[in-house]
């Protein structure tokens, strides 16, 4: 078995955290009152040389919880019709239960301690996941209660861009604005972007960390 703290294994790269890319589409900005309408999750994998790539994915359309607020402006922005039967929507419980199961399996297989949400403007997605978890009464939430990796902040640092589409294009990742604001597409692009930035930092010599003795020779 490889050393769990080795720099080129997933558990050693992010201090025991298992990064999972999440995107949500919603009926507004308030995680407590507004509907969670769509969610996608992509796990990440690391090869033997320490390069990060997207892994497994799950995607669900979600039924608004009872009494959920649906802001017309938010629905116009996402293009989601919550009442369309062709959405094949499931309950918040069903969607999160499946995602949590996938994530817990990844944590175990990669010898990590806990999952951490990777998202673009991550506080938004994190707040909706946490609120839905509380509403459904789901136990054993695998995600850290407040820590996240925000690709908007990382994109500003690495690429000089904070908008997802512009950050992707700057990084050489194709981005189709016609598919944007679909949770599945945005999660896929965010996963590619996060992997590109992590791998670029490694390529530039920023990882593995150099010890003081190695620096001074």
Swiss-Prot record:
Its cofactor is Mg(2+). Mg(2+) 2 binds at residues 23, 25, 181, 186. InterPro entries: Exonuclease_RNaseT/DNA_pol3 (IPR013520), RNase_T (IPR005987), RNaseH-like_sf (IPR012337), RNaseH_sf (IPR036397). SUPFAM superfamilies: Ribonuclease H-like (SSF53098). GO terms for molecular function: 3'-5' exonuclease activity; magnesium ion binding; nucleic acid binding; RNA exonuclease activity, producing 5'-phosphomonoesters. Its EC number is 3.1.13.-. Residues 20-194 form the Exonuclease domain. One of its GO terms (cellular component) is cytosol. The record marks 29, 77, 124, 146 as: Important for substrate binding and specificity. SMART domains: EXOIII. The active site is at residue 181. Keywords: Exonuclease, Hydrolase, Magnesium, Metal-binding, Nuclease, tRNA processing. Mg(2+) 1 binds at residue 23. Binds two Mg(2+) per subunit. The active form of the enzyme binds two Mg(2+) ions in its active site. The first Mg(2+) forms only one salt bridge with the protein. GO terms for biological process: DNA replication proofreading; tRNA processing. It comes from the Bacteria. It is an enzyme of class 3 (hydrolase). NCBIfam families: RNaseT. Homodimer. PANTHER family: DNA POLYMERASE III SUBUNIT EPSILON, RIBONUCLEASE T. Belongs to the RNase T family. Trims short 3' overhangs of a variety of RNA species, leaving a one or two nucleotide 3' overhang. Responsible for the end-turnover of tRNA: specifically removes the terminal AMP residue from uncharged tRNA (tRNA-C-C-A). Also appears to be involved in tRNA biosynthesis. This is Ribonuclease T. It comes from Photorhabdus laumondii subsp. laumondii (strain DSM 15139 / CIP 105565 / TT01).
């Amino acid at each position: 078995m490889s050393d769990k703290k080795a720099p080129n294994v997933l558990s050693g790269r992010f201090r025991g955290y298992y990064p999972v890319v999440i995107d949500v589409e919603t009926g507004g900005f308030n995680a407590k009152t507004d509907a969670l309408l769509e969610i996608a999750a992509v796990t990440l994998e690391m090869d033997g040389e320490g390069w990060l790539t997207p892994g497994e994915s799950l995607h669900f359309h979600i039924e608004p919880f009872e009494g959920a607020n649906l802001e017309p402006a938010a629905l116009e922005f996402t293009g989601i019709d919550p009442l369309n039967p062709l959405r094949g929507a499931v309950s918040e419980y069903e969607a999160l239960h499946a995602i949590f199961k996938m994530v817990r399996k990844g944590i175990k297989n990669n010898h990590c301690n806990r999952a951490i949400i990777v998202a673009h403007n991550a506080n938004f997605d994190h707040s909706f996941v946490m609120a839905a978890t509380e509403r459904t009464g789901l136990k054993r939430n695998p995600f850290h209660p407040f820590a996240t990796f925000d690709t908007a902040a990382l994109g500003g640092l690495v690429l000089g861009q904070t908008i997802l589409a512009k950050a992707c294009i700057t990084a050489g990742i194709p981005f189709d604005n016609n598919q944007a604001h679909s949770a599945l597409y945005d999660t896929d692009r965010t996963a590619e972007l996060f992997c590109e930035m992590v791998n670029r930092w490694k390529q530039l010599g920023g990882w593995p960390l150099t010890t003081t003795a190695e620096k001074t020779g």
